Curated annotation (Swiss-Prot):
Gene3D superfamilies: 3.30.70.330. This is Interferon-induced 35 kDa protein. The lineage of its organism: Eukaryota, Metazoa, Chordata, Craniata, Vertebrata. Induction: Up-regulated by interferons IFN-alpha and IFN-gamma. Phosphorylated. Dephosphorylation correlates with the formation of a complex with NMI. GO terms for biological process: innate immune response; macrophage activation involved in immune response; negative regulation of cell population proliferation; negative regulation of non-canonical NF-kappaB signal transduction; positive regulation of inflammatory response; positive regulation of innate immune response; positive regulation of non-canonical NF-kappaB signal transduction; positive regulation of toll-like receptor 4 signaling pathway. It comes from Homo sapiens. The gene is IFI35. The keyword Phosphoprotein applies.
């Protein structure tokens, strides 16, 4: 499996916690409409324009969980550069000429340019099953000032008390905007979900929280297609005659010249010979 495909699948897994919450909402909607439940829940993923903003990552390891925006990691080979222009029309003009000659004082650099395409997930199909011993706790205010450990401890104490409808907590996990709690005995999760609303003391304030069923979701099928990145181009086969900073300046000057079809450069990252890089793409709104 290619590295870009691995990166796309990894980004998909990072979104799984958010998708679990959405699966629960979809199931509730079916109940309201009187529809019969189904095991598989296919839905389309909205198209998200991507842009490289100059962030790179040296270590190929990616965090196991992601709290906010979609991120796709694109490997950059040795002797290459990634350029993002302010205007997508400039990128189109640059790509019309597949080989560029960069004039320098003592020599010329001949480099190739090509469009950048990233693998994007277009459709996800997941199987879902309500967990009998786990719940999802939501409603945490952004102003809450507690560390992860403090928050989990306080929730375990509160929902571990039988007078609050709870029981012994044996699993706890912080998710994006929510917390998953697992209980040692049957019936506790169902009882808490029936109550639904709780006021929990957190950080010196009384915080209203919602408890809902936790959905175990597993990706069954993912359709992937290549999507062009309209404002970015790859520069390849850069010879090893300049160091990184000097090469960066030479490329930026060349590709900003209107006479070469260039224009304003928003971000430029160079990977010299003997090195490797990882470009991080986020959504346009990110």
């Amino acid at each position: 499996m290619s590295a870009p495909l691995d990166a796309a699948l990894h980004a998909l897994q990072e979104e799984q916690a958010r998708l679990k919450m959405r699966l629960w909402d979809l199931q509730q909607l079916r109940k309201e409409l009187g529809d019969s439940p189904k095991d598989k829940v296919p839905f389309s993923v909205p198209k998200i324009p991507l842009v490289f903003r100059g962030h790179t990552q040296q270590d190929p390891e990616v965090p196991k969980s992601l709290v906010s925006n979609l991120r796709i990691h694109c490997p950059l080979l040795a002797g290459s550069a990634l350029i993002t222009f302010d205007d997508p029309k400039v990128a189109e003009q640059v790509l019309q000429q597949k080989e560029h000659t960069i004039n320098m004082e003592e020599c010329r650099l001949r480099v190739q340019v090509q469009p950048l395409e990233l693998p994007m997930v277009t459709t996800i199909q997941m199987s879902s099953q309500l967990s009998g011993r786990r719940v999802l706790v939501t409603g945490f205010p952004a102003s809450l000032r507690l560390s992860e450990e403090e928050l989990l401890d306080k929730l375990e104490i509160f929902f571990g008390k039988t007078r609050n409808g709870g029981g012994d907590v044996d699993v706890r996990e912080l998710l994006p905007g929510s917390v998953m709690l697992g209980f040692a005995r049957d019936g506790v999760a169902q009882r808490l979900c029936q109550i639904g609303q709780f006021t929990v003391p957190l950080g010196g304030q009384q915080v209203p929280l919602r408890v809902s069923p936790y959905v175990n979701g597993e990706i069954q099928k993912a359709e992937i297609r290549s999507q062009p990145v309209p404002r970015s181009v790859l520069v390849l086969n850069i010879p090893d005659i300049l160091d990184g900073p000097e090469l960066h300046d030479v490329l930026e000057i060349h590709f900003q010249k209107p006479t070469r079809g260039g224009g304003e450069v928003e971000a430029l990252t160079v990977v010299p010979q003997g090195q490797q890089g990882l470009a991080v793409f986020t959504s346009e709104s990110g």
